[in-house]
């Protein structure tokens, strides 16, 4: 799993608008979601390529036997058909941008 971290020197200050623009420039459609504390997504897959991007909170992702905790500014590519799970970690909701490409 390769996490792309926000780089303020390259990307500027982190904001929802800036992260959305970065993903849209790559050809993704972007939707915003808020996941409450305790949210858990069991193993599943998608029929499209996507990127999970975190604006705030902490999001544990498990994929192909690996685990990573995404934090503000982190992006993780989830290829179509790859089984993964996710859960909110800690006591803060996760604000996420879900970027999809057909």
Annotate the PLM regions:
Residues 1-32:
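A short, N-terminal "cap"/entry segment at the start of jelly-roll beta-barrel domains
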Residues 20-22, 40-46, 63, 87-89:
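Short histidine-centered beta-strand/loop micro-motifs
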Residues 58-60, 67, 83, 93:
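Structural motif
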Residues 80-102:
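Ligand-binding loop in jelly-roll beta-barrel domains
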């Amino acid at each position: 799993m390769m996490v792309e971290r926000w780089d303020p020197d390259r990307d500027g200050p982190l904001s929802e608008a800036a992260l959305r623009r970065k993903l849209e420039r790559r050809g993704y459609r972007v939707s915003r979601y808020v996941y409450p504390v305790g949210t858990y997504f069991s193993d599943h897959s998608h029929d499209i390529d996507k990127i999970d991007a975190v604006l705030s909170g902490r999001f544990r992702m498990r994929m192909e036997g690996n685990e990573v905790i995404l934090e503000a500014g982190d992006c993780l590519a989830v290829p179509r058909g790859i089984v993964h799970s996710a859960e909110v970690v800690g006591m803060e909701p996760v604000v996420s941008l879900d970027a999809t490409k057909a």
